[in-house]
A protein has these predicted regions:
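A structural signal for multi-pass alpha-helical bundles of membrane permease subunits
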Residues: 4, 8-296
Length: 296
């Protein structure tokens, strides 16, 4: 009886493709297609109902003549410049504290990470609004120490401060990244520095910071991207006011898309935001790259 041998080579050839096909399909449907569609819609006059009408770069030209766009761009830049450095500093300080070998430190790490999980959901927003009302806990504390109550929602700086405070409260993600990096620093470095007479501050600036350079850069990029896309907090807490002082680009995109049904313009603004954020990230890469070459 003649034996039949099956050659598995043909099957093995397509096995890998079969396993990665769900990822490829998902990428094409949920990443590449929306990406290309958004770019094309940004060059049309489209209200979401009638067929889009190609207008070329008219949306981009009118964008830079739009006072709302210029204001939202300024607010987003101002917000990012204030928030990102503060969040990095607070996250690093908390990571240094939580890196200490103290009993129950695991519980403290969990507690400080919880705000990042909660984010800016409705319950957190209500709590935040209660804290900063005219007779809220924050103003009561300020009156107690003799500073006096502040009209947080009635002035531009106060409203932006509320948004910044809310996002600073969510320092847990950056803190965890710093904490993991701190635990990777060999303790022998600190022992050698101590033998050489280097104190804690000396060890921090000569060992800890240089060893955290890449992680600081990573957190800087992540926090910058997040800040440039800000929408939830100002939308739910201040509504962009007062006087559009918290009206970010994210809110402008939302209003143009769902309030004014100007989908073409909204997609164009989103692409400008994408390009600006990408340029900032590339500049940071260039700066850190040249800095490393200089150190070498």
């Amino acid at each position: 009886m003649k034996k039949i041998y099956h050659n598995p080579t043909g099957v093995k050839k397509y096995t890998g493709l079969i396993f990665i096909s769900p990822f490829i399909v998902g990428f094409l449907l949920f990443t590449l297609y929306p990406f290309v569609s958004s770019f094309l819609l940004g060059m049309t006059d489209y209200n979401g109902i009638s067929p889009p009408e190609f207008t070329g770069f008219s949306n981009y030209i009118s964008m830079f003549e739009d006072e709302k766009f210029r204001n939202s761009l300024f607010v987003t830049f101002r917000y990012s410049v204030i928030l990102v450095p503060l969040k990095l500093v607070i996250s690093l300080i908390m990571a240094l504290i939580l890196n200490l070998e103290i009993r129950g430190m695991g519980l403290y790490r969990t507690i400080f990470y919880i705000p990042s999980i909660l984010g800016s959901n409705l319950a957190v927003v209500i709590m935040w609004q209660f804290l900063f009302t005219g007779d809220g806990l924050v103003n009561q504390f300020l009156e107690f120490i003799g500073i006096g109550a502040v009209n947080w929602y009635g002035n531009e700086n106060g409203s932006l401060s509320i948004i910044v405070f809310l996002r600073l409260w969510e320092f847990g993600s950056a803190m965890i990244i710093f904490l993991n990096a701190l635990r990777e620093i060999p303790p022998e470095y600190y022992d050698a520095a101590k033998v050489d007479g280097c104190g804690k501050m000396c060890a921090f600036f000569s060992i800890t910071l240089p060893m955290l350079k890449d992680v600081i850069f990573l957190n800087l990029i992540l926090q910058l991207i997040s800040a440039m896309q800000e929408f939830n907090a100002p939308y739910m807490i201040t509504g962009g006011g007062p006087m559009k002082s918290t009206y970010t680009i994210g809110m402008l995109i939302y209003d143009e898309m769902f309030k004014y049904h100007n989908s073409g313009y909204a997609n164009a603004v989103s692409w400008v935001l994408f390009v600006i954020t990408t340029v900032f990230v590339l500049l940071l890469f260039r700066f850190t790259g040249s800095h490393r070459e200089g150190n070498q």
